Swiss-Prot record:
Residues 109-292 are annotated as: Binding to phosphoinositides. One of its GO terms (biological process) is regulation of apoptotic process. This is Tumor necrosis factor alpha-induced protein 8-like protein 3. GO terms for cellular component: cytoplasm; cytosol; nucleoplasm; plasma membrane.
Amino acid sequence: MGKPRQNPSTLVSTLCEAEPKGKLWVNGYAGTQGTRDATLQTRLIPLSFHLQRGKGLAAPLSALSAPRLPERPADGRVAVDAQPAARSMDSDSGEQSEGEPVTAAGPDVFSSKSLALQAQKKILSKIASKTVANMLIDDTSSEIFDELYKVTKEHTHNKKEAHKIMKDLIKVAIKIGILYRNNQFSQEELVIVEKFRKKLNQTAMTIVSFYEVEYTFDRNVLSNLLHECKDLVHELVQRHLTPRTHGRINHVFNHFADVEFLSTLYSLDGDCRPNLKRICEGINKLLDEKVL
């Protein structure tokens, strides 16, 4: 007679000192792997388990696009491939099309919050971590992203391209957040993190200053600051992420640093002025809260 079945509501975590060879055998569970420094961290999660977040329930794991489990061998064990999580995190297999966003409200409604949740669920399907589960884009940042989408759509006259730019921005931000929160950056890279924070803070204050003080706007100054931020991001993730993600970084920063886009955004009598006002209000809030 076989062993009694384990309670599926429990969470089992196994820490292995070294990466296992070949297959990792798990009784009746689907396994996902995460790495922290040189240690392989394997979290075994029942498919019915729900990730808990500070103020409520996050998306259930059963809603994620989980890979099909292999057939159970004669001894009743399930085989799960043991692969490094850093590489899995940067994989985009099974990704939705790059078309316009589709939400419950209809295809013309853009929500950066919804897009961020989709991206996180995709990454969470490859890495099981409570830290990652709690990493949701805050409401203020979400509101800023929504306004950036609107002005990008206004400038490009292309909803599909505007959506793709914001999708790339959110993906890059989440991936960097995962690396940082899971202590994947070396001491040298942490120095780059501090440089990037200072440069981002300088850029944020410049964006607000150019809006609040009329006739001070200089599109070349702001463009150069954004390109400097881009270079620091490339340097930071050089050994962690794939060329595809580096392409996303270029796609995002090259758009927002484009002098023609900046001129449209800061035009005193342009249609984007109300959006710029809300963007700067959000940035000011993040500055006051020491987020930027």
